[in-house]
């Protein structure tokens, strides 16, 4: 699967939720491996903020990104749409300190993405695959986010609002392809009891019933409710009439929790990589979401290169006989047993290391260790299979080493190990020359890596 960006640019206009300013945000295509970036085009020097979890400077009333003096708030809805729609790279321009709130959901972003289109890029999509349970908790609030291994990406959110009118809810997104229909149009919400402190803090200047669900669930005095109505420029309401205050009816009974799930995805976008795993979030909010995103980035840095998933029960893409048809190597120099994954730019091969390998007789009799040069040779044979896969009549071609760089051996390879080779093309093959980066894994650990250049020659 390849990385994706937008086919073109689109803009959205509206009021900022907290500032009340008229704002424009423009989403633009971006190069491979650039991720999400936000540029304050209204400031001197037009600073660019990388949209990553470490750059979050506030989570009290939304996610605020910052770099130096530059700040951008209310970014989560736009980022949620990008992430859920599979966009990997995007440059975002905004002419003020926050994104426009629009209707309080992500649906307008989704509609614009569909309208402008999505473009596939050349670089492979770099998923982070969850291999073990990761959990982040906030003991003070009881919030918790857990991610578990799964072949796909899904989220379940469970919320408890400490309200008699709206108590416990849950929402689930089992397939990101359903995001536009099940999640994107869920609107942000606020309790009447929280509005006065926000107004006193000089916030929600752009808030109204067109961009939020307002929940009146604790009776207050008529005088106080009238005062809040005047401040928000809405009609007065009977103080004994509890319920939802809005221009549009609820789309789902659990719309509030669906919006919480939307926010989780927006804050997950700050991890910087698409994830394969199942998330269960209890009492989510921007603070715990950001704490989770930061922890995920730490995990990714620990395992910058992930081992491929290997299921010995699955049929190989190439068995040893097919490999023998493509490569000239024979025992004892055919060092790839099978290929389990083969794409346009990436290959994954397997070799089982046994005690009766002939090189162990001399390397070393008392402490058998696979020679590093043979590890590189095995990795290069995988690379040869990858390059040959791009050619017509691959049996008529051979590959030859030209250069090896940046070789690192990190761990001994011994009898009983199963080697997984992962080799990626660094650039398209040009004039018969290919550049590749290869890794060897034992379990989850990188045991060796190298960059190499090879020449392909038609000689049969």
Where are these regions (language model features)?
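Beta-strand-rich interaction surfaces with strong enrichment in secreted/lumenal proteins
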Residues: 12-13, 366-367, 408-412
